[in-house]
Amino acid sequence: MLVFMSDDLAGFSRQTTVPDGAAGRRFDAVLAELFPEFSRSRLTEWIKSGDVLLNGVLVRPRDPVYGGEVVWLQVMPDIRTDAVPQDIPLDILYEDEHVFVINKPAGLVVHPGAGNPDGTLVNALLHRDPALAAVPRAGVVHRLDKDTSGVMVVARTLQAQTALVEQLSSRQVHRQYLAVVVSALVSGGTVNAAIERHPRDRLRMEVSDTGKEAVTHYRLRERFRAHTALECRLDTGRTHQIRVHMAHLRHPIVGDRLYGGSLKLPKGGTDALVAMLRGFKRQALHAEVLEFLHPVRALPVRIVAPVPEDLCQLLAALREDSALFFEREWR
């Protein structure tokens, strides 16, 4: 059975099992039969780069299989091999010889690509630790959108990266986000709605019956008169997942120009809130909590990224507006 898993980097991961009848054959040959949509040369490249695990460990293309092993295929977009170190400040929440945990600011792209050849998190990481040049994708394990802030883990060794990718694929990593959405919700809930790339606008994702499984749990953190602060937890990690799911509920994230539609201002809002909403230039989404098992020590790690100043100011303006509104209503 083939299982589709997370695609945090707009890549994908899949799990399947080696059939018993394949015993004694080369791993790369069996892999080509399990994933016929990819060329054998590409699969061999992924094996060598550490993107494929057999029973949780790295193997060589020529190694034999015995039947019954679990295959993990985790593919992320290639990061430019010519990325250069750049002295870009990093807010490091935790580090040891195996991992960095970064508090990524809004506005910082994770890896170089079209339109962002440098000035990215990868460039900053290579400056902070030149040895990351020897780790696939410079140690990047998962990503955040450019205008989403918050906590990310980066592997400093291939061993750590392999273990963390496996945890992500098997949904052992806990990720909690703070999101400020339009409308005053009365309760939390779960969105179980598959997501795929929009057929015409390739920058967008959309809910679709033919998409990949996507599950988001959300609960109320703070309720205002026309907005709500939510805590969102991911079971899966699809591209733009929280943004797409909240828009699907018709409660788009404040400041989300891709999925939020036109600016929505509360009737009778304070001048401070109106100015804040007009001037909020990114989606109000922050990766606040990351929990995982240390990839080497196997101990639980829990890291909390402080709420950034722009979101604190937005929440303060919402509180003030709500207080004044309800004060007028109660008179």
From Swiss-Prot:
Similarity comment text for this entry: Belongs to the pseudouridine synthase RluA family.
Coiled coil: none
Record function comment: Responsible for synthesis of pseudouridine from uracil at positions 1911, 1915 and 1917 in 23S ribosomal RNA.
Domain S4 RNA-binding: 25-97
GO BP term, example: enzyme-directed rRNA pseudouridine synthesis
Keywords, ordered alphabetically: Cytoplasm, Isomerase, RNA-binding, rRNA processing
Active site as annotated: 145
SUPFAM superfamilies recorded: Alpha-L RNA-binding motif, Pseudouridine synthase
Main location: cytoplasm
Organism: Xylella fastidiosa (strain Temecula1 / ATCC 700964)
Enzyme Commission designation: 5.4.99.23
GO CC annotations on file: cytoplasm
Catalysed transformations (reactions): uridine(1911/1915/1917) in 23S rRNA = pseudouridine(1911/1915/1917) in 23S rRNA
Subcellular location: Cytoplasm
InterPro entries: PsdUridine_synth_cat_dom_sf, PsdUridine_synth_RluA-like_CS, PsdUridine_synth_RluC/D, PsdUridine_synth_RsuA/RluA, RluA_PseudoU_synthase, S4_RNA-bd, S4_RNA-bd_sf
Superkingdom of source: Bacteria
GO molecular function terms noted in the UniProt entry: 23S rRNA pseudouridine(1911/1915/1917) synthase activity; RNA binding
The name this protein goes by in its record: Ribosomal large subunit pseudouridine synthase D
